Design a protein with these regions (language model features):
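Structured, basic alpha/beta domains of bacterial-type, RNA-associated proteins
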Residues: 1-108
Length: 108
């Protein structure tokens, strides 16, 4: 099954709110999700979001492909950088060290 990590729109008219979900790529945008892995609120001043990094990394390791919007959120949270380091074959200590550097240089 080809899975995607993408945004599911909920909320009322002119007040969007999104859930980050893992879903079969053949399903419609608001179809039944396999798992909810976070949320994103673009209306708040800080564009608030909360992502379950461990579950997203699990699904990425299973072959799930994020959409562009989902990838932007993952990049903002540092999950995309962590996934990149895992793909390079770094061990956990090196990854933690690189993530601390990333936290310091972050432009959020």
């Amino acid at each position: 099954m080809a899975t995607k990590i993408r945004l599911k729109r909920i909320g009322r008219r002119n007040r969007p709110f999104y859930r980050l979900i893992v879903i079969d790529s053949r399903k419609q945008r608001d179809g039944a999700a396999i798992e909810e892995v976070g949320w994103y609120n673009p209306i708040d001043d800080g564009h608030s979001y909360d992502l379950k990094g461990d579950r997203i990394l699990h699904w990425l390791s299973q072959g799930a492909v994020p959409t562009n919007a989902a990838h932007k959120l993952m990049r903002r949270a540092g999950i995309a950088h962590r996934w990149h380091l895992i793909q390079q074959g770094m061990d956990e200590a090196e990854i933690d060290k690189e993530m601390k550097k990333w936290e310091l240089n972050r432009e959020d």
